[in-house]
Amino acid sequence: EPYYGNSEVKMPQIDSEWNLELMPNRSGQYWKVFVYKDLKYNALFTRSLGWNGGDGVFTTGLPDGNIFWSFNDSFYGVINENRSRGNCSFPRNSIMVQTPGEKDENLVWLADYVQTNDPNADRYYQVRTHIRHPKATLSDEKIQAGEIDQDYLYWAGDATIYNNQMQMLWGAVDNTDPNNLMRRFGTCLATYSLEGKPGDATYMKLISRNDNFNDHTLGYGDTMWEDEDGHIYLYTTSNYKVAVARTATRDLGSQWEYYVADPQGHFSWTTQYPSTQDAE
């Protein structure tokens, strides 16, 4: 059946300002599904220096109207004239704030650059990982030289605003076992200042971090929902199934409860961290 073969399926009404380009059947998707290429953000994130690609992207709206972005594995460095990557580093996480607007100057990269002065020298526009895991073994000397931890690292979870500060979850990852790479083994709760404006020393300054917040192997908080009932609902997946937890209050540091099933399949909330099977 043709992609638009059913006359009952109507094309979505897309605002032209969104600058989306329809991708009909590009991936062989179900014909009722409409997929678009985001030309606006393709243009915004087309780079020649600095950050030029990353995964694990999260955004959080901030009270001042800015948007906080976090990335996991990223590329920082030089892009050649033919759009291929030149010399790039591979920080395992990075952060940025977007001020209102869709121009390059609206992207404020909160990165620790190795050097930005000499394009002919090593590590030009390369950066260090934003937040390191305390078990990472590289020496300070190697970190200052621009090397990146590969053994223990943090990957981003979601973030929320509480008491005019930003709370963010960072998932601890163990890469030391070649037979069990990217093993989740805990969560860090980090708190950032929102005092001032982008570019100020106080803005998005890391105020505190609890690297031992929990030892969860499930990534609760990969996605969050701040509900009107006063809880934050924390979502993750396990074996292609959804697992859910929630906070007691809007503070991520408050007591967590987990939505688990009993042997009869009835779900309820419990403060006891569940087994993977119970969480599913």
For each predicted feature, which ranges?
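Beta-rich carbohydrate-recognition and catalytic domains
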Residues: Y3-N52, G61-Y152, I161-N214, E228-H231, ...
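Beta-rich catalytic cores
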Residues: G53-D55, L153-W155, L218-Y220
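Hydrophobic core register within WD40 beta-propeller blades
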Residues: T59, A159, D222-M224
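Long, low-complexity, proline- and polar/charged-enriched segments
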Residues: T217-E228
